[in-house]
Amino acid sequence: MLNQLNQLTTEASNPASAQIDSLSALQIVQLINQQDALVAAAVNTQAEMIAEAVDVIADRFRSNGRLIYLGAGTSGRLGVLDASECPPTFRTPPEMVVGVIAGGPEALTRAIEGAEDHPEFAERDLAKINLSSNDVLVGIATSGRTPYVIGGLKYARSIGAFTIGLSCNPNCQLRPLSQIMIAPIVGPEIVSGSTRMKAGTATKMVLNMLTTGAMIRIGKTYGNRMVDVRATNEKLVARSRQMLSEIVGISGDQAEQLLQQCDGEVKTAIVVHIKEVSPQTARQMLVDVDGHLSRLLATPSE
């Protein structure tokens, strides 16, 4: 175990922070920020693999497949976080993007001792959510050696699911199990081995790209507007009203009335206004173009 850890980039000592305990608060903050500035460049080296993954995920979404994140500790929490943001942002069903964490929901708020050390637990957890050959499994392990994640990837391969590995160590144990391997090398952490820092930031950046990219590819935005937003609070209600008002050129009051007619669906409301059809017809028109509003609006009205 010790020899394995010594070989991991994420476990190495960072020379830049060797004397960090003698620095002032301002110097500590500046040093952390300087190190964080390296993360985006590391993620950018993986752009082609991330883009390939985006297209695979979008294809699975189109055939009613799911995106499943699997991880332990920080990696698992980040997967659950990204998955939980998809329903309000893109009006997706909760089961379309799912985060699975070693130790279950309790592990979101506290460490569950030994949860990540059992590969067989991953098979059990994935079987519970009925992982299928139509799904994509993203195994997240910044170290690249977490038994729980390795077990999950092996199980996913055995049933024919598409596998993607995400690690911050280059030649890791996830690689031979992953059809696409994403490995941004962020280097040693400010606090040695504390992968909630740079590695965690890189992980969150990649997950943002995977879900956002795939959702854009399946028509969940209009330009850069989140027209499939589910308005679950006052902020999102106001955003929906403003978005509709700006896109179709009507007042805020008119936008509010139109949204009420369309059950709060911005995309439907846009079609109703521009194409002069009923909400029911607008929804069917969107289905006919696989939800791509820009494609629909480019079609002349009959």
Swiss-Prot record:
Keyword Metal-binding recorded: no
Pathway: Amino-sugar metabolism; N-acetylmuramate degradation
SUPFAM superfamilies membership: SIS domain
Superkingdom, natural source: Bacteria
Listed PROSITE patterns: GCKR (PS01272), SIS (PS51464)
GO biological process terms on file: amino sugar catabolic process; N-acetylmuramic acid catabolic process; peptidoglycan turnover
UniProt protein name: N-acetylmuramic acid 6-phosphate etherase
Species per Swiss-Prot/TrEMBL record: Rhodopirellula baltica (strain DSM 10527 / NCIMB 13988 / SH1)
Taxonomic placement: Bacteria, Pseudomonadati, Planctomycetota, Planctomycetia, Pirellulales
